[in-house]
């Protein structure tokens, strides 16, 4: 089959005395039938290339499905007289949300299950389903949930009467994907945020149950197009907090849930560069702020005097404080120290760290727990330890293991190894990596290795257990995650050093990680693949230009690769919100810096690795046209005969197809491609179970 070749239509961009040629700009017009024809031609080519790998794909997929437990159930969380949980049955695509009425956890086994929401039933109507936020009224009689069926960020609120099982007539459209819906205490009103034409959440509304949505009252509007609007309820349920925030500045108002018709109360006005978060505890507000504290400090002030702030604990620059979890009897803080997630209990003005046994792990306080609880649920996992839920007794400080997530099939953790590695980046910066592999995988020299990275928005790539990774580990594949700058694994400064005019650090850190793995004989350029999605797709796309010779395969998923053009186009969803992350190319300094690494603008006439690229036609975060243009230019310019494929999902968005088996199928396809290029047989198995 011949290569798909996109036609070239000259479209120069001129700015700051510079001209950027963009012959594939026309691919942005999804209403143009030639655009759809080109995407479908690329899809046909993709399927032609993947046809010889069908058997390998199926073998990988089946090995992943074999790791799906017969049933999975989350540890029930108590709210009043009910315990709420979700469960996932072996052959189901989606979870089932349920509850049991019981006086204590010990009585749950004999209690009767009531299904609150079965996503499998909802999904029968369409190929795609996403349900994100779910909110229960205080009296447990009504459930509001957000639903989407096209892969965009525009969701609709549905409200279910749990006494009758029927949906109410209330339907609220155009609501943001998350952080966008809360009930007042009485359950007669629901607050929600809607998006503008660019899918930016910017308006807060109040809806009275049973009334026409057209009569809903606009409570607040965020008019600065570099800010977004989110809402969340305090742990105590007393307040709804309304967040106006950019990536560098925040402002918060609050609503008393007992007085839903009362006006908003401002906590602290926005000041450039000052970020803060709030919570309610006892008679005070807790404030987590970066004012005078790069890694954030914890303050408190009386509800009747918000200007009187005092420190809760002394600021420690080695600790990055990120989340507050106030309960009636104790205050827990989540954050980072020494490159790892941590949880502390506030006691007598000090932070007492909860200790764990492994050197590498990820730990988090589960969200949406009852303020009155004496048992806080904490989730723990590592590269080798499945998700484990502990109950922390707030009175004694003791941890009790409540559940270890089931792993289907044989799994002996003693046959695997996890470790932390350090590469030396530019200016001597030490770049952390986490690695997991089969014992003995490195005994015979360089091993096939997949290097993953993200490194943007301060998001972290922490060590987590993945049962679907086990079949690949058993084949001798080494998995490494590079915790590059742009994430916040090493604190807030780690993030600041990987954004804006420091963005190239993200890419050079990743390259340093790859070189370290080669130098230390973990792998070789002929045996290494690079993976990343979204902003991680930008990472591996930039690295393909800067140091593609280090990799045999590069796999960018929904990649952000046309940085300058996108950041100049304010008609694209979320563009204005991103200027504090990447820069504003209307400014000359930002323009030339962004151009220096943008993958699309730096494609050269040289050899590139094998590349497997995915995108979604309805993606609101990274337009399909970015990878489409990139692939078209690569096909026209690159000098090698290596395989380049692009798969466009014609019915989904940024997160691909919905349903867990669909996700596994897509993962199996990409792994089949990677293993084929790395020379690993799909049926090959290094591990012989003892």
UniProtKB/Swiss-Prot annotation:
Keywords of the record: Hydrolase, Protease, Serine protease
Catalyses which reaction(s): Hydrolysis of -Arg-|-Xaa- and -Lys-|-Xaa- bonds in oligopeptides, even when P1' residue is proline
Entry keyword annotation includes Protease: yes
GO molecular function term, any single one: serine-type endopeptidase activity
SUPFAM superfamilies found in the cross-reference section: alpha/beta-Hydrolases, Peptidase/esterase 'gauge' domain
GO biological process: proteolysis
First-tier enzyme category under EC: hydrolase
Pfam families assigned: Peptidase_S9, Peptidase_S9_N
EC number: 3.4.21.83
Residues at the catalytic site: 534 (charge relay system), 619 (charge relay system), 654 (charge relay system)
InterPro entries: AB_hydrolase_fold, Pept_S9_AS, Pept_S9A_N, Peptidase_S9_cat, Peptidase_S9A, Serine_Peptidase_S9A
UniProt record similarity statement: Belongs to the peptidase S9A family.
Role summary: Cleaves peptide bonds on the C-terminal side of lysyl and argininyl residues.
Protein name stated in the entry: Protease 2
């Amino acid at each position: 089959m011949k290569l798909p070749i996109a036609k070239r239509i000259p479209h120069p961009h001129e700015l700051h005395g510079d001209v950027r040629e963009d012959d594939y700009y026309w691919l942005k017009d999804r209403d143009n039938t030639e655009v759809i024809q080109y995407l479908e031609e690329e899809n046909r080519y993709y399927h032609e290339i993947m046809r010889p790998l069908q058997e390998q794909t199926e073998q990988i997929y089946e090995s992943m499905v074999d790791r799906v437990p017969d049933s999975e159930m989350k540890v029930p969380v108590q709210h009043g007289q009910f315990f709420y949980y979700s469960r996932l049955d072996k052959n189901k695509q989606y979870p089932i949300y349920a509850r049991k009425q019981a006086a204590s956890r010990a009585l749950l086994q004999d209690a009767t299950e009531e299904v609150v929401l079965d996503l499998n039933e909802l999904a029968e109507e369409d190929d795609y389903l996403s349900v994100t936020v779910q909110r229960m009224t205080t009296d447990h009689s009504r459930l509001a949930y957000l639903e989407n069926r096209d892969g965009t960020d525009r969701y609709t609120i549905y409200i279910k009467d749990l006494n009758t099982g029927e949906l109410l007539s209330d339907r609220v459209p155009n609501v943001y994907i998350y952080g966008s819906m809360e009930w007042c205490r009485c359950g007669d009103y629901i607050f929600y945020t809607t998006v503008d034409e660019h899918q930016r959440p910017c308006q807060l509304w109040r809806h009275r149950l049973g009334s026409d949505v057209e009569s809903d009252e606009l409570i607040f509007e965020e008019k600065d197009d570099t800010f977004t609007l989110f809402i969340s309820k305090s742990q105590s349920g007393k307040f709804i907090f309304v967040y106006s925030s950019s990536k560098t500045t925040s402002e918060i108002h609050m609503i008393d849930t007992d007085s839903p018709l009362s006006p908003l109360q401002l906590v602290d006005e926005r000041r450039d560069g000052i970020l803060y978060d709030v919570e309610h505890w006892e008679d005070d507000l807790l404030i987590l702020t970066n004012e005078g504290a790069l890694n954030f400090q914890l303050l408190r002030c009386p509800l009747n005097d918000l200007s009187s702030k005092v420190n809760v604990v002394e600021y420690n620059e080695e600790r990055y404080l990120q989340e507050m979890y106030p309960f009636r009897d104790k205050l827990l803080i989540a954050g980072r120290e020494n490159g790892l997630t941590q949880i502390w209990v506030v006691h007598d003005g000090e932070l007492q760290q909860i200790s764990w046994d492994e050197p590498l792990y990820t730990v988090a306080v589960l969200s949406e727990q009852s303020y009155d609880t004496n048992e806080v649920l904490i989730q723990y996992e590592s590269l080798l330890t499945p998700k484990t839920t502990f109950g922390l007794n707030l009175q004694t400080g003791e941890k009790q293991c409540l559940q270890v997530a089931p792993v289907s099939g044989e799994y002996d953790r003693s046959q695997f190894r996890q470790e932390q590695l350090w590469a030396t980046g530019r200016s001597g910066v030490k770049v952390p990596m986490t690695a997991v592999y089969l014992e003995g995988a490195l005994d015979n020299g360089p091993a096939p290795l997949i290097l993953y990275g993200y490194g943007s928005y301060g998001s972290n790539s922490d060590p987590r257990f993945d049962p679907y990774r086990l079949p690949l580990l058993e084949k001798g594949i080494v998995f490494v995650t590079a915790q590059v700058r742009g994430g916040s694994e090493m604190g807030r400064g780690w993030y600041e050093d990987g954004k804006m005019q420091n963005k190239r650090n993200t890419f050079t850190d990743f390259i340093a990680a790859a070189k370290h793995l080669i130098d230390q004989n973990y792998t070789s350029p002929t045996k290494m693949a690079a993976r990343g999605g979204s902003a991680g797709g930008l990472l591996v796309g930039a690295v393909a230009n800067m140091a593609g010779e280090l990799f045999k395969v590069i796999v960018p998923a929904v990649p952000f690769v046309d940085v300058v053009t996108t950041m100049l186009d304010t008609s694209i969803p979320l563009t204005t919100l991103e200027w504090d992350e990447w820069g504003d190319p209307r400014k000359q300094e930002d323009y030339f810096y962004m151009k220096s690494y943008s993958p699309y603008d730096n494609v050269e006439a040289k050899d590139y690795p094998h590349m497997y690229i995915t995108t979604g036609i309805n993606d609101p975060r990274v337009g399909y046209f970015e990878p489409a243009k990139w692939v078209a230019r690569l096909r026209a310019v690159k000098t090698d005969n290596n395989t380049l494929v692009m798969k466009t999902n014609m019915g989904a968005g940024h997160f691909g197809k919905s349903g867990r088996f669909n996700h596994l199928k897509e993962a199996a396809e990409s792994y089949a491609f990677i293993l084929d290029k790395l020379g690993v047989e799909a049926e090959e198995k290094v591990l012989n179970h003892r």
